[in-house]
């Protein structure tokens, strides 16, 4: 069995070329399995990576340092000039090219190869000498944002080209690239830990080029700030960059930041990661060269152990680059650097370790006293990043460590009270941690100068590793199995396998393979507690990485921790072993064996949850082999977290952990607790609420998704105890509804909201929602607004009328909701706000009416109009059901009222406006019902229906058209309908196109409409309220004349509803546009007051329709409105001009012709000053044909301007015309000439000073046309005389 296991494990040697975490460390199989010859400082293989080189030493002599996909500085230098050659003929051409490049790079919607080519084009410009033009540096500043966006791109090729381009800019421009370098360096640092090697190495190489060529002191804080990054690879690289900076820069560039440099290097010398410490020691050399005094002060401030290690390093390295690559442990190594040296571990006393090394054979017995240190046991956490340390002196000649030197008592060291992190000095002066685990790793270990066993470098997957294969995490460690009857571990050195590197996942790795966390079904090993308060070693985590493997600590000093913590290293080792049950059983037996030998009892299993030994569906193979919910499903074993359902404190500690995998396991344990109905104490609840509050912002997707699942169970179990936390819960969930989440996560948030709504008192929820709505510290997004409003609406359906309280907070919230009905950016918000007002009105009509009465007049107008239309439609839709008592609707009682939103149509199933009357309507006739409605409406109509804006800008109206009623909608019954609406340009919600009535023939009778809760197409006339009331509720409607204004309002509402069907119902929309064109010629002021904004916005949106005839018709309608009501465009001039000019780009001639006609009318309709101010920037910046249309339009406008006004506007007009006169398009040049002629016609010879930039030939041509215009020889159409002239 032992041979079989060894063979299986060693089959995975192919992983020995896995790369380190930052994707840029050399490794090869050859160096991993051979004892290297002693190396001298001059040996190039032994020398550390040259800080300035991205490539570094080649692994195996063939591959680049970063491995497949990596790039180095040589690649960059080749790519600098490996670009298409172009020539620059003028600064203007250069500016145009740079503008196009910026446009492409600033928009990530362009194809990625276009963006990559644009980046290459920048290098082409540099090669062509763009840096010699002054305008280049101005445009380079504008390119900063585009370069940053490219460096953040998801396409590695775009990122690579961006990095090469930045490096080239730095190389060519030097310190002139200071602003760009300062902007791009933070983005480049973000590439360092990237899992794609091409991105990581490109970012590193670009930073090196910037450091070499752009010596700007402002870069120093950017680099030093990353020296304290939470990412280990970023810290390593930052110190490497700092070292390069200290080598390359002059002292005067560093003086301003000397203190920062000293502090950063000091932190680096104390860094938790070994390689970061090595790089920091290198930077000390550079610091000493620049600032010897500060360096001396820094040295004196270090603890003795750090001074010793630094001194040893300085002695052993003749230069910065000669440091041997020894002891490059991973960030998970545990060290006690503060512990003083012990004389027995001195390098001058090699006999102290004689018992560890086999000098003459393969089976030398260890000294009795050296049992605690005489094994080659490798702690997985400590050895995960250990580099092979090269032998020296006698240890070199000793060959490899005799594996047989281990006697059966080796496992006793697991319990040895002296097994602590003793400080030992290696040959580079570092203090090493002595750690032990219960796993025997037999490999090609090497020894240092004291005979200390060393292990090979461990390859680590990068953060965010793309591999999800279980095979990537299989170890090649040779593990000897322990038979059930044996009491010792037998190791045969003859068959000892070579130790390979152990691939290990880093923090954000996607690997959730069963092989990482497998625990045998029959294993009695509990999951170790890491974040327990009693286990202080958890706080000594020496890395800032949050890898799951690193969450378990080695044995601590004094052996004073609990059994579960003591076994953490063992379980940590198991997480990287294969999933075979024989391996796991061997580990379990080994652990029990260690306990027996030290006369300790086995660990007590504290966690025995339900189903521990069952094979139910929860542990079946139905789920993915890589599912994080069943790590060991392939073995049928129960995940360890299933056994932790009793220790609430540990579950909470895991939930609060900074390690995402622990948080996830804590949530799973909490789910089990809740499913077992395990209630939490008040203290536990308080702590869990604090943890959950933080988890709403958890950055890890898996944790957040599981948190939402756990939250639902938590609410259901503890809903009676969480009322104090309800505000946080509800507001955070609503905020999450506005976030960009995956559909599945969004559904979980919605489920949590539904459970919350069902679990807590309605009045408490309502008060919290009102409070949240008016909270001035909150600025909810549009999506959050919709979520809040929909929640209030749904809550109102299940509330009792008594739950609605007319408090000051509620009034403020309702006024806020009323303002949301006018939200210009989102129709969803407008619809939802209108629904909320209707729902609250139906919930408790008297109370809500009183609340409206207390609001300012402006808020009353919008709400009253909306509610009136709702009442009208509700009553209108129920007329068809009044004839039979069987179909007569019954209003909602206080206990079971239904919201109108639940019934899409007001037919026989529809409900009358609730709470207007609480008595039985079964015996009421239609007159009784309408008198009841009248009472409610009269209360609403006590408000003022005209805003101050209407009073200040009265328009002419025909009073005869303001009052009255519509045609009778049924025998003996009037249609409850209001009169025309007052103009209220401050109420854009009344223009909401999406909430208009569904298309119904205007003159159909009876007028039975589909119920639409958002309808507000009509409103109450402000001119004759008493007549209005009579019109609404008098049974004999024939006494009132037909109201044309009302008919027009209805028609417009229906037309707009039809026009909202973009890209659909083409023929119907054509008819609607023709009808709208007819309406533009009628003076229905109230209709236009109410609907103008909606009509305009819809027409402008229709200009983007896919049907050209619709686009052309929309422009024609716009032209007619401009002709008949130009004053209304005062506030929309810029938008209208822009959209009309953009239509000139249309590929269909019919649309372009309509756009030209509309632009011509537009030029004569809007005030000349306003029009010129809009057109001038367009003429200067727009491309053909928009600039042509703008120039023609400006020509027409200038004809309307007085001489004095034109003189004032001339500085704005002339630059665009002079620029256009030089345009490549002849038609643009012609238009500029005619525009200049028009200007001359107004101001005469005062134009000449502004023409100084024109060449002689252009002046000659202009004078010719000016003379023609003066003599009239050009005729009515001067364009006929300029063909070929320009």
UniProtKB/Swiss-Prot annotation:
Localization terms from the record: Cytoplasm, Cytoskeleton; Cytoplasm, Cytoskeleton, Microtubule organizing center, Centrosome; Chromosome, Centromere, Kinetochore; Cytoplasm, Cytoskeleton, Spindle
SMART domains: TOG
The protein's name in its UniProt record: CLIP-associating protein 2
UniProt keyword Phosphoprotein present: yes
Region (TOG 1): 66-317
Post-translational modification: Phosphorylated by GSK3B. Phosphorylation by GSK3B may negatively regulate binding to microtubule lattices in lamella.
UniProt cross-references to InterPro entries, sorted A to Z: ARM-like (IPR011989), ARM-type_fold (IPR016024), CLASP_N_dom (IPR024395), TOG (IPR034085)
Region annotation (Disordered) ranges: 17-70, 320-350, 355-374, 410-473, 492-566, 606-638, 870-920, 944-990
Quaternary state and interactors: Interacts with microtubules. Interacts with MAPRE1; probably required for targeting to the growing microtubule plus ends. Interacts with CLIP2, ERC1, MAPRE3, PHLDB2 and RSN. The interaction with ERC1 may be mediated by PHLDB2. Interacts with GCC2; recruits CLASP2 to Golgi membranes. Interacts with MACF1. Interacts with SOGA1 and MTCL1.
Biased composition (Polar residues): 341-350, 872-884, 893-914
Gene name of the record: Clasp2
Gene Ontology cellular component terms for the protein in this record: basal cortex; cell cortex; cell leading edge; centrosome; cytoplasmic microtubule; focal adhesion; glutamatergic synapse; Golgi apparatus
Biased composition (Basic and acidic residues): 417-431, 606-616, 947-964
Main location: cytoplasm
Sites of Phosphoserine modification: 14, 20, 322, 333, 336, 374, 376, 413, 461, 465, 469, 484, 495, 513, 531, 535, 570, 572, 581, 614, 620, 884, 944, 947, 1005, 1021
Family: Belongs to the CLASP family.
């Amino acid at each position: 069995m032992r041979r079989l296991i060894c063979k299986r494990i060693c089959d995975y040697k192919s992983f020995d070329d896995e790369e380190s975490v930052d994707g840029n460390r050399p490794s090869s199989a050859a160096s991993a399995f051979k004892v290297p010859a002693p190396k001298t400082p001059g040996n190039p293989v032994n020398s550390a990576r040259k800080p300035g080189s991205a490539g570094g030493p080649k692994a195996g002599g063939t591959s680049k340092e970063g491995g497949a996909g990596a790039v180095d500085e040589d690649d960059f230098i080749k790519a600098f000039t490996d670009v298409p050659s172009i020539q620059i003929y003028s600064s203007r051409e250069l500016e145009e090219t740079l503008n196009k490049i910026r446009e492409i790079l600033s928009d990530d919607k362009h194809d990625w190869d276009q963006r990559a080519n644009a980046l290459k084009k920048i290098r082409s410009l540099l090669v062509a000498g763009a840096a010699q033009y002054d305008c280049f540096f101005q445009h380079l500043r504008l390119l900063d944002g585009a370069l940053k966006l490219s460096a953040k791109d998801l396409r590695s090729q775009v990122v690579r080209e961006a990095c090469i381009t930045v490096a080239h800019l730095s190389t060519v421009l030097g310190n002139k690239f200071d602003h760009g370098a300062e902007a791009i360096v933070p983005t480049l640092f973000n590439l360092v830990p990237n899992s794609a090697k091409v991105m990581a190495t490109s970012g590193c190489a670009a930073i090196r080029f910037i450091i070499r060529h752009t010596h700007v002191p402002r870069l120093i804080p950017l680099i030093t700030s990353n020296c304290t990054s939470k990412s280990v690879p970023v810290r390593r690289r930052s110190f490497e960059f700092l070292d390069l900076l200290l080598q390359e820069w002059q002292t005067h560039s560093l003086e301003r930041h000397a203190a920062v440099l000293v502090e950063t290097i000091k932190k680096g010398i104390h860094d938790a990661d070994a390689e970061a410490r090595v790089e920091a020691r290198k930077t000390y050399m550079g610091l000493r060269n620049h600032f010897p005094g500060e360096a001396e002060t820094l040295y004196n401030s270090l603890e003795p152990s750090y001074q010793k290690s630094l001194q040893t390093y300085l002695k052993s390295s003749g230069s910065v680059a000669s440091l041997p690559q020894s002891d490059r442990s991973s960030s998970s190594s545990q060290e006690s650097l503060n512990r003083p040296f012990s004389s027995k571990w001195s390098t001058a006393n090699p006999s102290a370790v004689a018992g560890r090394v086999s000098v003459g054979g393969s089976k030398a017995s260890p000294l009795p006293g050296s049992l605690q240190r005489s094994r080659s046991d490798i702690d997985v956490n400590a050895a995960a990043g250990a580099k092979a340390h090269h032998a020296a002196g006698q240890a070199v000649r000793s060959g490899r460590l005799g594996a047989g030197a281990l006697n059966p008592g080796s496992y006793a060291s697991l319990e040895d009270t002296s097994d602590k992190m003793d400080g030992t000095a290696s040959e580079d002066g570092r203090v090493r941690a002595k750690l032990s685990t219960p796993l025997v790793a037999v490999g090609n270990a090497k020894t240092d100068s004291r005979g200390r066993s060393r292990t090979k470098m461990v390859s680590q997957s990068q953060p965010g590793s793309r591999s999800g294969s279980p095979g990537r995490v299989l170890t090649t460690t040779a593990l000897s199995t322990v038979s059930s009857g044996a009491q010792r571990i037998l190791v045969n050195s003859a068959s000892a396998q070579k130790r390979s590197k152990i691939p290990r996942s880093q923090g954000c790795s996607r690997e959730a393979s069963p092989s990482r966390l497998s625990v045998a079904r029959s294993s009695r090993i509990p999951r170790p507690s890491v974040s327990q308060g009693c286990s202080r070693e958890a706080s000594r985590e020496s890395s800032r990485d949050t890898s799951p493997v690193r969450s378990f600590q080695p044995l601590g000093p004094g052996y004073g921790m609990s059994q579960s913590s003591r076994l953490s290293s063992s379980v940590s080792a198991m997480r990287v072993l294969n999933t075979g049950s024989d391996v796991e059983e061997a580990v379990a037996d080994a652990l029990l064996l260690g306990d027996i030998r030290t006369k300790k009892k086995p660990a007590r299993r504290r966690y025995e949850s339900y189903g521990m030994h069952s094979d139910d569906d929860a542990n079946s193979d139905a789920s993915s082999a890589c599912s994080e919910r069943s790590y060991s499903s392939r073995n049928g074993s129960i995940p360890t977290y299933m056994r932790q359902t009793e220790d609430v404190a540990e579950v909470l500690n895991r939930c609060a952990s900074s390690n995402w995998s622990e948080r996830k396991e804590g949530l799973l344990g909490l789910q089990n607790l809740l499913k077992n109905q395990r209630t939490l104490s008040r203290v536990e609840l308080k702590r869990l609420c604090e943890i959950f509050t933080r988890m709403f912002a958890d950055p890890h997707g898996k944790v957040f998704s599981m948190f939402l699942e756990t939250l639902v169970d938590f609410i259901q179990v503890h809903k009676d105890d969480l009322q104090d936390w309800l505000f946080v819960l509800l507001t955070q969930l609503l905020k999450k509804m506005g976030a960009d989440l995956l559909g599945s996560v969004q559904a979980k948030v919605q489920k949590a909201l539904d459970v919350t709504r069902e679990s807590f008192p309605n009045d408490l929820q309502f008060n919290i929602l009102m409070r949240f709505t008016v909270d001035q510290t909150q600025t909810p997004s549009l999506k959050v607004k919709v979520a809040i409003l929909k929640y209030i609406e749904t809550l109102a359906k299940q509330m009792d009328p008594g739950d609605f309280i007319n408090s000051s907070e509620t009034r403020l919230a309702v006024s806020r909701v009323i303002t949301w009905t006018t939200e210009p950016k989102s129709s969803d918000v407008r619809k939802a706000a209108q629904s909320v007002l209707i729902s609250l009105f139906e919930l408790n009509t008297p109370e809500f009416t009183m609340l409206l009465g207390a609001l300012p007049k402006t808020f009353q107008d919008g709400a009253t109009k909306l509610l009136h239309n709702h009442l009208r439609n509700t009553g209108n839709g129920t007329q068809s059901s009044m004839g039979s008592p069987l179909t007569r609707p019954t209003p909602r009682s206080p206990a079971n009222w239904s919201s109108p939103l639940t019934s899409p149509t007001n037919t026989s199933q529809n409900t009358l406006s609730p709470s207007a009357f609480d008595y039985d309507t079964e015996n009421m006739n239609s007159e009784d019902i309408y008198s009841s409605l009248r009472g409610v409406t009269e209360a609403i109509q006590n408000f003022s229906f005209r805003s101050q804006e209407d009073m200040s800008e009265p328009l002419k109206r025909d009073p005869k058209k303001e009052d009255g009623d519509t045609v009778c909608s049924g025998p003996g019954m009037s249609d409850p309908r209001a009169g025309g609406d007052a103009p209220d340009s401050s109420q854009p919600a009344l223009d909401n196109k999406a909430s208009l009535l569904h298309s119904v023939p205007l003159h159909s009778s009876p007028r039975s409409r589909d119920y639409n809760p958002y309808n507000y197409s009509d409103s109450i006339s402000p001119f004759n309220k008493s007549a209005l009331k009579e019109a609404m509720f008098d049974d004999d409607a024939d006494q009132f004349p037909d109201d044309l204004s009302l008919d027009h309002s209805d028609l417009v509402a229906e037309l707009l509803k039809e026009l909202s069907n973009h890209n659909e119902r083409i023929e119907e929309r054509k008819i609607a546009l023709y009808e709208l064109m007819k309406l533009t010629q009628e003076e229905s002021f109230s209709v236009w007051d109410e609907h103008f904004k909606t009509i305009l916005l819809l027409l402008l949106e229709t200009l983007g329709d896919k049907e050209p005839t619709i686009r052309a018709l929309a422009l024609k309608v716009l032209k007619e409105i401009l002709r008949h009501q130009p004053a209304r465009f005062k506030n929309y001039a810029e938008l209208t001009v822009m959209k009309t000019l953009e239509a000139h780009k249309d590929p269909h001639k019919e649309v372009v012709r309509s756009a030209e006609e509309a632009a011509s009318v537009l030029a004569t309709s809007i005030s000349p000053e306003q029009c010129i101010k809009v057109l001038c920037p367009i003429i200067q910046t727009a491309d053909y044909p928009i600039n042509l249309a703008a120039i023609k339009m400006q020509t027409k406008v200038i004809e309307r301007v007085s001489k004095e006004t034109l003189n004032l506007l001339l500085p704005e007009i002339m630059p665009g015309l002079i620029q256009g006169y030089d345009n490549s398009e002849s038609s643009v040049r012609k238009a500029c000439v005619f525009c200049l002629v028009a200007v001359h016609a107004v101001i005469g010879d005062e134009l000449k000073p502004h023409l100084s930039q024109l060449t002689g030939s252009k002046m000659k041509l202009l004078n010719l046309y000016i003379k023609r215009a003066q003599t009239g020889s050009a005729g009515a159409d001067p364009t006929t005389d300029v063909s070929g002239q320009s």
